[in-house]
């Protein structure tokens, strides 16, 4: 059971324990800050279910955040069926069984490789509803200190490096997706953007969007 209200209230604790308890006031404080950053920066901040998927709180989230990101068929369904908007979906690999559901529940689909894109893009074209597709890029830079968790570590299979991108992107690729942060600061984001621009700027005129992935700890006190 999930109860949303003021932590310590008799309603939440005395009569209905065990339960998950969320402090709505603190939640709204964080969401207000996140929305403020999005508005001032001119970006769209989307909710990652990988870190938070308490669906009972979605009505509150929808007041501040419009979209979510998914990494599986069930997260895509959660976005579409419970959050009320189609997901921005990325997965290292899709299956023939899951992909029709992924398409039904997604507005954006990112592929990890061009082989995955070539395999599934004909299904996107035949789907009948607009889905914008992208490719995950690897900037070969990350400040994640634990090598095990570094998606840009040598030998990684996450994303495509600049030397493997064709000069002209395949028809149907409209965006780039990058994920190389974990509880990161704005300074780490700044450094990442510099590397992305250095390696991938020549393709920018060909794309419509850039997804910078998760791991941005915006609510941390020292986040600039």
Protein language model features and the residues they cover:
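Single conserved hydrophobic/aromatic residue that forms the stacking wall/gate
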Residues: 1-8, 12-13
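Gly/Ser/Thr-rich beta-alpha loop segments that engage phosphate groups in nucleotides
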Residues: 7, 50, 215-217
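Active-site-proximal beta-alpha core segment in soluble small-molecule metabolic enzymes
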Residues: 43-207
């Amino acid at each position: 059971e999930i109860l949303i209200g003021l932590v310590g209230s008799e309603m939440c604790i005395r009569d209905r324990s065990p339960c998950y308890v969320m402090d709505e006031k603190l939640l709204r404080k964080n969401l207000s800050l996140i929305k403020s950053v999005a508005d001032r920066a001119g970006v769209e901040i989307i909710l990652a279910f990988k870190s938070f998927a308490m669906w009972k709180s979605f009505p509150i989230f929808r007041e501040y955040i419009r979209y979510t990101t998914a990494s599986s068929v069930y997260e895509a369904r959660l976005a579409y069926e419970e959050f009320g908007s189609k997901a921005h979906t990325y997965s290292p690999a899709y299956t023939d069984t899951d992909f029709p559901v992924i398409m039904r529940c997604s507005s954006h689909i990112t592929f990890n490789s061009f082989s995955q894109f070539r395999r599934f893009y004909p299904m996107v074209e035949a789907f009948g509803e607009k889905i914008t597709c992208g490719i995950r890029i690897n900037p070969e830079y990350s400040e994640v200190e634990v090598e095990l968790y570094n998606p840009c570590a040598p030998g990684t299979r996450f994303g495509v490096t600049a030397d493997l991108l064709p000069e002209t992107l395949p028809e149907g690729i409209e965006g780039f997706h990058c994920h190389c942060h974990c509880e990161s600061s704005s300074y780490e984001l700044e450094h990442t953007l510099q590397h992305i621009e250095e390696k991938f700027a020549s393709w920018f005129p060909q794309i419509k969007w850039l997804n910078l992935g998760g791991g941005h700890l915006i609510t941390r006190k020292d986040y600039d």
